[in-house]
Amino acid sequence: MLNIYDYTLEELKRRLHPPFRAKQLYHWLYHRYEEEFEKMHNLSKEIRQKLTQDYSATLTKVVREEVSEDGSRKYLFQTHDGLTYEAVLLKMKEKKEDEEGRIVEGEKYTICVSSQVGCKVGCSFCFTAKGGFVRNLSAGEIVYQIVALKRLNALAPEKRVNIVYMGMGEPLDNFENLIQAIRILSELDGLSISTKRQTISTSGIAPKIEKLGALDLGVQLAISLHAVDDELRTRLIPMNKAYNIASIIEAVRRFPIDSRKRVMFEYLVIKGVNDDEKSAKTLLKLLNGIKSKVNLIYFNPHEGSEFERPLESKMVAFQKYLTDRGLLCTIRESKGIDISAACGQLREKIIKEENCGNR
């Protein structure tokens, strides 16, 4: 059985005849969020039968939802082969102008999606790394995270959302399926999520950053840097042995960036590890000449971790050092702490519950 969400509109046009039926199917999948082919009444009976026979829109399903006090929602998905992965919906307030020029408060949504079941990178601070790598998600398994979260939260197809490939897994390690998912999500007759609203967060596979840049898709780039010297970064991210800081920075310098955008450098701040002024000074020098923004992230403690959450005063001082010298720097607002929103934590929680139940 084939996953219907694996295909672009053009690919479905080649599979369905006449081709205009593919556009109708896309409307049902991505505008009506319909998963049962038999309910797609403007498709012929013959096409509905073919779709039911050869394809499925329900190979992946949501098996758990947790809601945070701050409005964040975390979902656990289960694949056809019994594997689980996660996605998170973040709801934030924003101020914008209405048609009469008045400033009004609204809401914006960001969906944090997974690209793999588990991860190969093995970051020492990451909860997902504890479970190792299982397999890549297909393009359809990536796409379905957005479809499901929009449907479950009654978000209209035209409601703009931002997508960050920052959940379980290293997106650039699943390159072909990632690119296919981006193309499906940005399809004008589908969800129509502009590539400018899609951010790929990578631990820094330098050759894949170059390859992504060569495609010039218009996506945004975020680098999980977390350290400013190779010795510490290798301790935190073992993959740094293969792709050191210099190679990553060089690849970023060649990456095509929209004139109104910046490369995001994510910096997970860990108490007593990388929260000092010397690190801030080195980071400033490292990013010199790059149109960039630094996003400071509080380390989110989890069971068994050797690291601790930094002091707020240290975060503020780090930010001030950078901003005082002209580097745009923000402190990420913590979301979903009460529901263990860090990637991999809900999956691990469910596995533990199941193991306890089987004793």
Curated annotation (Swiss-Prot):
The active site is at residues 86, 343. Pfam families: Radical_SAM (PF04055), RlmN_N (PF21016). Residues 105-338 form the Radical SAM core domain. It comes from Wolinella succinogenes (strain ATCC 29543 / DSM 1740 / CCUG 13145 / JCM 31913 / LMG 7466 / NCTC 11488 / FDC 602W) (Vibrio succinogenes). Binds 1 [4Fe-4S] cluster. The cluster is coordinated with 3 cysteines and an exchangeable S-adenosyl-L-methionine. Transmembrane segments: none annotated. Disulfide bonds join 112-343. [4Fe-4S] cluster binds at residues 119, 123, 126. Specifically methylates position 2 of adenine 2503 in 23S rRNA and position 2 of adenine 37 in tRNAs. m2A2503 modification seems to play a crucial role in the proofreading step occurring at the peptidyl transferase center and thus would serve to optimize ribosomal fidelity. This is Dual-specificity RNA methyltransferase RlmN. It catalyses: adenosine(2503) in 23S rRNA + 2 reduced [2Fe-2S]-[ferredoxin] + 2 S-adenosyl-L-methionine = 2-methyladenosine(2503) in 23S rRNA + 5'-deoxyadenosine + L-methionine + 2 oxidized [2Fe-2S]-[ferredoxin] + S-adenosyl-L-homocysteine; adenosine(37) in tRNA + 2 reduced [2Fe-2S]-[ferredoxin] + 2 S-adenosyl-L-methionine = 2-methyladenosine(37) in tRNA + 5'-deoxyadenosine + L-methionine + 2 oxidized [2Fe-2S]-[ferredoxin] + S-adenosyl-L-homocysteine. Reaction proceeds by a ping-pong mechanism involving intermediate methylation of a conserved cysteine residue. InterPro entries: Aldolase_TIM, Elp3/MiaA/NifB-like_rSAM, Methyltransferase_A, RlmN_N, RNA_MTrfase_RlmN, rRNA_lsu_MTrfase_RlmN/Cfr, rSAM. One of its GO terms (cellular component) is cytoplasm. One of its GO terms (molecular function) is rRNA binding.
